[in-house]
């Protein structure tokens, strides 16, 4: 007989983390797939960004849509009924247009591509299943998450929460190369399964900034608040242009390899307009721009992070059952009814001058006689980090105050 005590599943993403718990006994239970995954991820990122801005329009935002979506897609493998439908719809998949098998195969291909070794940059993802020693997973769920999501399984003694926390945090710290530490705290002894996804990216600018040119400058948080920030500077030929639709300047800074940072600088007082008019379709269009212009770029050094309660955020996207006693995760295990008792997402970003002494650093750029356009990111702006090989939004952010971690 299943225990009548609610138990939890912990979900950690980007780190993204979901905690699964046992429920009470009486709980109620067109495009090709390879193109559909990035498109759906872009729409999911857009929806999640809007939820986060509604919660606070004065805070920095930073999250990894691909990390959160991967963790949820893994959960959907074992979900049934409305729980299953809510997850896939919340991830912006139209189940009348794409088969579920194609969704999971699409994630498999995406993860395989993202994890290919690159000499130019580091981009790795990982999925871990931490199982209570007494919990027996269904064979199909176990095989599917290993095959499709390359998940590793680790036996865990959740009856000793401190040891379980230590084990999960060590996995996360290693996967993120020490960037995310002590993510899991106050773990409940009722937890029986933790599902962890992490993503780690380290890139070098194709055209690095010179440290000697970085100086302290003003950043205008709002009309009444100004802070001093280290501002990087570089004059040269950039993929940059003004878009009247969103009333913003768009700047693309390439990393070595297939990754690009896309920065969006709204005109004075037009941040809300930018947020209301920016669409995934425009982002894809911007990312493919190739024309260049001469510009004098001023970009603040950044070290920001985002930590989010996924239960609250995803609830606004219609994903509610999986966090409640209405959850049907009967495809995960027959031993006990599960629900996600806690969902955590943490992502960190550092942007600085670093680059290699490669073509970008030594490349000759002839300047026109006219003055270059001055693109100074000295006020709030948006940005995305996009993988071109898959058209996937790896990270999404909004900088309101670069001095806030």
Curated annotation (Swiss-Prot):
It comes from the Eukaryota. GO terms for cellular component: extracellular space. One of its GO terms (molecular function) is serine-type endopeptidase inhibitor activity. Residues 360-379 are annotated as: RCL. It is found in: Secreted. The record marks 369-370 as: Reactive bond. Induction: APS rose several hundred-fold during the acute phase reaction. PROSITE patterns: SERPIN. Keywords: Acute phase, Glycoprotein, Protease inhibitor, Secreted, Serine protease inhibitor, Signal. Its main location: secreted. One of its GO terms (biological process) is acute-phase response. The keyword Ligase does not apply. Residues 1-24 form the signal peptide. Inhibits elastase, chymotrypsin, cathepsin G, plasmin, and trypsin. This is Alpha-1-antiproteinase S. It comes from Cavia porcellus (Guinea pig).
């Amino acid at each position: 007989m299943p225990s009548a005590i609610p138990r939890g599943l912990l979900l950690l993403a980007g780190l993204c983390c979901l905690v699964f718990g046992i429920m009470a006994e009486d709980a109620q239970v067109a495009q090709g797939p390879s193109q559909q995954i990035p498109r759906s991820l872009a729409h999911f990122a857009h929806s999640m960004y809007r939820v986060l801005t509604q919660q606070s329009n004065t805070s920095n935002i930073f999250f990894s849509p691909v990390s959160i979506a991967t963790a949820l897609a893994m959960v959907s493998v074992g979900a049934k009924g409305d729980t299953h439908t809510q997850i896939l719809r919340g991830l912006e998949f139209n189940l009348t247009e794409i088969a579920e098998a194609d969704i999971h195969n699409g994630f498999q291909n995406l993860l395989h591509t993202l994890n290919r070794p690159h000499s130019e940059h580091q981009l790795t993802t990982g999925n871990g299943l931490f199982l209570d020693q007494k919990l027996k997973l269904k064979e199909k769920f176990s095989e599917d998450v290993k095959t499709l999501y390359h998940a590793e399984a680790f036996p865990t003694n959740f009856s000793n929460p401190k040891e379980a926390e230590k084990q999960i945090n060590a996995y996360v710290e290693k996967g993120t190369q020490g960037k995310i530490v002590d993510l899991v705290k106050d773990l409940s002894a009722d937890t029986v399964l933790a599902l962890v996804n992490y993503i780690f990216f380290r890139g070098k600018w194709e055209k690095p900034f010179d440290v000697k040119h970085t100086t302290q400058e003003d950043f205008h948080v709002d009309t009444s608040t100004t802070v001093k920030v280290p501002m990087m500077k570089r004059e040269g030929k950039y993929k940059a242009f003004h878009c009247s639709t969103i009333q913003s300047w768009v700047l693309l800074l390439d990393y070595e390899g297939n990754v690009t940072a896309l920065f969006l600088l709204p005109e004075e007082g037009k941040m809300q307009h930018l947020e209301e008019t920016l669409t995934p379709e425009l982002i894809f269009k911007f990312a493919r721009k190739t024309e260049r212009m001469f510009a004098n770029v001023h970009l603040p050094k950044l070290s920001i992070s985002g930590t989010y309660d996924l239960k609250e955020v995803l609830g606004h996207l219609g994903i509610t059952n999986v966090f409640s006693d209405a959850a049907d995760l009967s495809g995960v295990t027959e031993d006990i009814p599960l629900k996600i008792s806690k969902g955590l997402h943490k992502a960190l970003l550092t942007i600085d001058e670093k680059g290699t002494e490669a073509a970008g650093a030594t490349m000759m750029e002839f300047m026109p006689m006219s003055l270059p356009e001055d693109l100074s990111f000295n006020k709030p702006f948006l940005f995305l980090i996009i993988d071109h090989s898959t058209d996937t939004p790896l990270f999404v952010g909004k900088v309101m105050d670069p001095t806030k971690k």
